[in-house]
Amino acid sequence: MIQQVHSHPDIYRIRVDLPDNSLQYLNSYVIKGVSGNLVIDTGFNRPECKRALCQGLQELDIRLQSDTSLFITHLHADHSGLVGLFAATGCPVYMHPVDYQYLVDSEDGSTWKAAEDNFMREGMPPAEIKTQFSNQARTFSPDPHFPVNPVHDGDCLHLAGCDLQVIHTPGHTPGLCCLYLPKEEVFFTSDHILFNITPNIQVWYHMKQALQRYLESLQKVRELPVRLA
């Protein structure tokens, strides 16, 4: 399902259903420009999500090629799962390097092993640990071998004919980044700010005091002029 949410620039929301998941769906956003396009987040790395996203892009007459860029807001599989689809066709991919490194580390199991060791130290029952690591975040993650253009807090990107500001908001993940269009006052919040549920704040072995960092990130964007989020 596609919905236009803003005109000049033309911004669309593609609903990507997440089968067998309590989150139900992901909103993938598309800025369609005259000389290029920007896709923000993808859905899981599974056929149903790929089909929904590709159908939406096809309806918008957007082809996966070098003039279409992909911005991954953070590493979670419902946002990054289909990054390989874009990278394989020459689309530039943008992502914060901290979250990208987590994806790389997860391939050899070191990310999950560090979390498992931490749970064991804290006394979590082994059966519960096993349940934690059989979730979809692991099953439907992307292959991390893709070229990435690293972005950092305060970076200004010119994509799809728009000037976008990168705002690093650690908390939900260490490298989560929002995108802001200052001229239009449009704010892509990703999972930093949700509307009817609260973001999950978990333990990260490379980021101490995740909840404190999240609250600081909320304060960081509190006074941002926003007409549409």
How would you describe each model-predicted region?
Residues 9-16, 135-140, 160-162:
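Short Pro/Gly-enriched beta-strand edge/turn motifs at strand-loop
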Residues 4-60, 179-190:
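Conserved beta-strand hairpin/beta-sheet module of binuclear metal-dependent hydrolase folds
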Residues 48-49, 58-157:
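Active-site HxH/HxHxD metal-binding segment of metal-dependent hydrolases
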Residues 37, 44-46, 137-142, 156, ...:
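Metallo-beta-lactamase
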Residues 1-6, 109-113, 123-124, 219-228:
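Accessory terminal helices/loops
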Residues 17, 42-44, 75, 97-99, ...:
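Active-site metal-binding loops of divalent metal-dependent hydrolases
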Residues 2-3, 27-29, 149, 154-155, ...:
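Residue-level detector of beta-strand structural context in well-folded domains
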